[in-house]
Amino acid sequence: MSLPESAPLSDVRAMRVALSEARKAAEEGEVPVGAALFQGRRLLWADHNRREGLHDPTAHAEILCLRHGAKKLGGWRLHGCVLYVTLEPCPMCAGALIMSRLSRCVYGAPDPGAGCCGSIYDLPADPALHSDTRWTAGILESECASLLRGFFRHGSLSKR
């Protein structure tokens, strides 16, 4: 999928792709986090949390996008790519995003419980990592947060 030439990729448009994935996660009983990886206007991969369905603790939306995007590009370095994710990345995902050499990460809602891009820790700012990845927070924040609140309010994780 690519966006039409006449339609510049905006953070809001791209985050809507990630939100669509987050809704799929909720329908599957997964924590509703979605992500979309773009190279320019080209969508490389969009996915959502699949930990429950895959029985894989690393099957976060961000990790799945990195894996599939790197495979499509034929290499693990994701220079020039931007990942949009509905929730602030956790320690595992923030580390993987930095190590992938991603150009930019854009996230919607902060995660006061596990967010590692400023909420509980700021991994990207750690000088030991020498990260060039740029980070943008708060795109469609209320929509992203509302989806998560609704999911947890209705006890959608009863099978955990």
Predicted regions and their residues:
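Zinc-dependent deaminase
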Residues: 1-25, 89-160
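Small-residue (primarily alanine) positions within well-ordered alpha-helices
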Residues: 18, 22-25, 35, 61, ...
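Short beta-strand scaffold segments in enzyme catalytic cores
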Residues: 33-41
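A cytosolic small-molecule/anion-sensing beta-strand core signal
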Residues: 39-40, 67, 79
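Glycine/small-residue-rich phosphate/adenosyl-binding loop
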Residues: 45, 62, 66-71
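A short, polar/charged loop-to-alpha-helix boundary motif
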Residues: 53-63
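Immediate flanking context of iron-sulfur cluster ligation sites
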Residues: 75-88
